[in-house]
Amino acid sequence: MDLEFGRGMRSPQRDSWKTTLLLAYQSLGVVYGDLSISPLYVFKSTFAEDIQHSETNEEIFGVLSFVFWTLTLIPLIKYVSIVLRADDNGEGGTFALYSLICRHANVSLLPNRQIADEELSTYKLECSSERTDKSCIKVWLEKHKKLHTALLIMVLIGTCMVIGDGVLTPAISVFSAVSGLEFSLSKDHREYAVIPITCVILAFLFALQHYGTHRVGFLFAPIVLAWLICMSALGLYNIIHWNPHVYQALNPCYMFKFLKKTRKYGWMSLGGILLCMTGSEAMFADLGHFSYSAIQLAFTSLVYPALILAYMGQAAYLSKHHDFYSNSQVGFYIAVPDKVRWPVLVLAILASVVGSQAIISGTFSIINQSQSLSCFPRVKVVHTSDKIHGQIYIPEINWLLMILCIAVTVGFRDTKHMGNASGLAVITVMLVTTCLTSLVIMLCWRRPPVLALCFLLFFGSVEALYFSASLIKFLEGAWLPILLALFLMAVMLVWHYTTIKKYEFDLHNKVTLEWLLALGDKLGMVRVPGIGLVYTDLTSGVPANFSRFVTNLPAFHQVLVFVCVKSVPVPYVFPAERYLIGRVGPPGHRSYRCIVRYGYRDVHQDVDSFETELVESLATFIKLDASYRCSDASGGGGDHEPEEERGTRLAVIGSSHASYDIQDSVQHSSAASVETTTTRRRSGGGDDDGSPGGGGGRAKQVRFFIDSHVASPEAADNKQVAEELEALAAARDAGTAFILGHSHVQCKPGSSLLKRLAVDVGYNFLRRNCRGPDVALRVPPASLLEVGMVYVL
């Protein structure tokens, strides 16, 4: 996690030129793999329509002009110059934009929001709240609740299309690279070689996801760099050898000549031209792994010139060759000299694998983010690296992607249909980014609405033109991303809707603290040894599932902790700010509330690390709470604070590094102390306490030292602190039980048919076939106690 925090929070001004150059080099393999392989299929997809490649070269020059200005307007101007600046604490992507908007305007649909969340270090605002409150756009957005839902749906549409791109990009990239074999095989063998080889490479690629990319990731940047140099060299050779005057096609007049001559078919061919932008969104989505200056430097100095040379070289060759058997032969390999075709083929396949790996990893990441916003069913998230927090693997999604990729390859069998499908997914994500960025310009950057409107109209009109050209090809492959998006949208909306309704049900049926305190006298409550962790989505009150539990079985643990694991609209929550600790009832009741906060890019800790850090945090909170109560009693404090505000003030961290700092600040409470010892089980263990790999490499123990003699005016209070710490230590030694609710959801009688289909059929099917909350929270089965709860929504 340290590495990820360092990347996400790096200030561009602090990077030396050596660091920037290194990051720019590394970004080639992660960010630009997909974008760099687009020359493999752009011309072939464009001329797959009924466009005749005539000897006047108006068609090929028009396509080159479109490609040049599209690469200039969208990746270079829109993304590199504008969108990359709309980062969320160094993070980019659709959820980063949505998070920024939610922090500057109350439009989030996430439940259990707290004022304490605004005190997080990563919860920074671009302007003061006084100025933000005067924004009429903000007031209008907050006033209409339907706009909140519309905004979330827009974000989910972009998310669904990114997932769809994770299916289509590996298929078209690898297929286009392998299709170079057509020039070395006879016509009878082409059909039986290209498709099987593509499927084998795809299966091999997805099978290796379980092992992670950190072992071979160092090869990605050299492969892409070699590929860019190769394309540039081929482009220069073709320009010099075939048509040095091809630069004339950069004149935008050729675009109008192209559309005038080709008319309807020229407009439809824009669906193939837009593929030159494939991978542009990765510049923004992977911003957190590098820096703005590094990504900008890599694109402007290497990627952009290499792509322009590659496309110009293809156009130069095609401008002197018109005798093709079919327009489908107007591809990348036709312009490669025979002597270097095999090395170029091997390098193209390697580059396509690197580009596919980037989109697969991005799919895992965006699904994990959707899960954190309660917009995706629970899936198993596995760390593939002990040192790098962001490298994750989701088994269920991986195998589904593999099956769909192979099915697309076998089903479509050509670049035309794959390109039509991929193009629609790509341009939809870009449209969503344009709309969200226009809101960021108004709400976060506090620019005039006219400026945001100009941004939206200019780039939105360009992308809408490409979108219409892709949508018209619905029957020729574009139906696939639409079908995938509709299915994923249904899953996400059903899960999100039911999750929100369950939270509202819990909020309505929670019981008061007085009820819990009076429960012991009414039922003869028994306190058993150990720590009981009651998981709930509520940040206040006692959940209904716990009241049901103690009503039927009047006993609970010696130390009771109500744990709320919640997501906040920030990319990361620093370990020192993750926990909010407060009391439930008087100190003698030994009941606490712990709110654990995660960002949308955070991955939950393993249970051993969480349990240890929770005990550390409780011990530190007990001491701090005693010192505050002493100061309040001596007249130094004011009115009694609400529980949530006290929890914010007493926020502590389970990380041993931050725990030492906190201990130094509370040494005035000498009644007890907490010592954290860390023992490495093997050398070379990771420094990432928050990752499962890091937890496996070290054993953490918490030891309590209770002073027998206390020489202070507050001896009685310190004695109470010592007793409370002794009780906590004894409960920790007795073991920990995890109490979770096992939900059964059903609709109210008289509900609409749509609601019954969504809840009774859709949600219950997903709940039964997806991971349970115990798996998502990594609860050991031996310590799990589930309480049945019926939700009538």
Swiss-Prot record:
GO BP terms in the entry: potassium ion transport
Ranges of the Extracellular topological domain: 44-59, 173-191, 237-264, 314-343, 413-422, 470-473
Record key words, sorted: Glycoprotein, Ion transport, Membrane, Potassium, Potassium transport, Transmembrane, Transmembrane helix, Transport
Listed GO CC annotations: membrane
Biased composition (Polar residues): 664-675
Residues modified by glycosylation: N420
Disordered: region residues: 664-698
Transmembrane segments: 23-43, 60-80, 152-172, 192-212, 216-236, 265-285, 293-313, 344-364, 392-412, 423-443, 449-469, 474-494
Domain of life: Eukaryota
GO molecular function, one term: potassium ion transmembrane transporter activity
Membrane topology qualifier: Multi-pass membrane protein
Cytoplasmic side: 1-22, 81-151, 213-215, 286-292, 365-391, 444-448, 495-793
Locations listed in the record: Membrane
UniProt keyword Transmembrane helix present: yes
Any single Pfam family the record assigns to this protein: K_trans_C
Predominant place of localization: membrane
Family stated for the protein in its record: Belongs to the HAK/KUP transporter (TC 2.A.72.3) family.
Chain's role: High-affinity potassium transporter.
Designated name of the protein: Putative potassium transporter 8
Organismal lineage: Eukaryota, Viridiplantae, Streptophyta, Embryophyta, Tracheophyta
Primary gene name: HAK8
